Amino acid sequence: MKILKNKRILVCGKGGSGKSSVVSLLGKSLLKNGYRVILLDADASNPGGLFRLLSTKINAPKPLIEFFGGREKVTCPSDDPSPMTRINSNLPINETVIDLSEIPEKYSFKKKDLTLFQIGKIKEACEGCDGPMSKVARDFIVKGDFVTLIDVEAGIEHFGRGVEKNVDVVLVIVDPTFESFVIAEIVAKMTSYLGSNNVWAILNKVDSKEIELIMQNSLKKREVNYLGSINFDKEIHKAGLEGKMIAQCKAEKKIEGIIKKLENLLETEMEYK
């Protein structure tokens, strides 16, 4: 039984914590374990984003927001919380769920059963805010037994726009910095406010057992659930420095353990419902 199928998992955290790297590794590991995976790059400020981490190709897919009419049609959820619609329809998209077959190939990058979408990027000065991209991240729910990973912008602004309303799990990536723990605590509280306890922290860039213990204790004091740890990985660090795709790395084994633990936690939750 694939516990994570039909789940939407949002990944957030402090800037520089390694969100996109972790999302790319989670996506590849889920694919390896037989899942059909959708990756949503919802970070308008990261020019390379997930595409750079997953592909050696030069040209990224077209912005997904254009399929829905661009920012001329898609509104910011803070100003207009109503559901998104298709470009030639006024019917709320949550009433007629998206089928992948209706989206032209130019809007996606595919690798076997993994499909990546870039919602949109800020490319020019004064072109406007990225609020409409947040609505796409909130409402883009695909028909079928996919697991969807949503890589949002750094910080917590996405909570203000309500992106988390349509997700099943929130994962917050925490690196060894004080600010990262502050954000993790806020994320846990805001997720709880929305009525969900399915929020867990993944410790990243852990370079020693001593640091890992300090980080775990800090999570405990702040009442943030711990899911797993990823050690500092030179291969990931080098790929980030050179702007290249992440190849094989030691972190993959840790990622597999994190996915297994998440499956077990959600399976236990289902048994108690």
Residue ranges and their predicted role:
Residues 242-252:
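C-terminal boundary of histidine-terminating zinc-finger modules
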Residues 12, 221, 225, 235, ...:
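P-loop NTP-binding site
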Residues 89-152:
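Cytosolic-facing regulatory segments adjacent to core modules
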Residues 42, 119, 232:
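Active-site loop/turn elements of alpha/beta-hydrolase fold enzymes
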Residues 4-42:
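Walker A/P-loop phosphate-binding motif and the immediately C-terminal alpha-helix
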Residues 128-232, 237-238:
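Conserved catalytic-core segment of NTP-binding enzymes
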Residues 31-111:
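N-terminal phosphate/diphosphate-binding loop that engages ATP/GTP or pyrophosphate donors
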Residues 8-10, 36-38, 114-116, 147-149, ...:
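Residue-level preference for the first positions of well-ordered beta-strands
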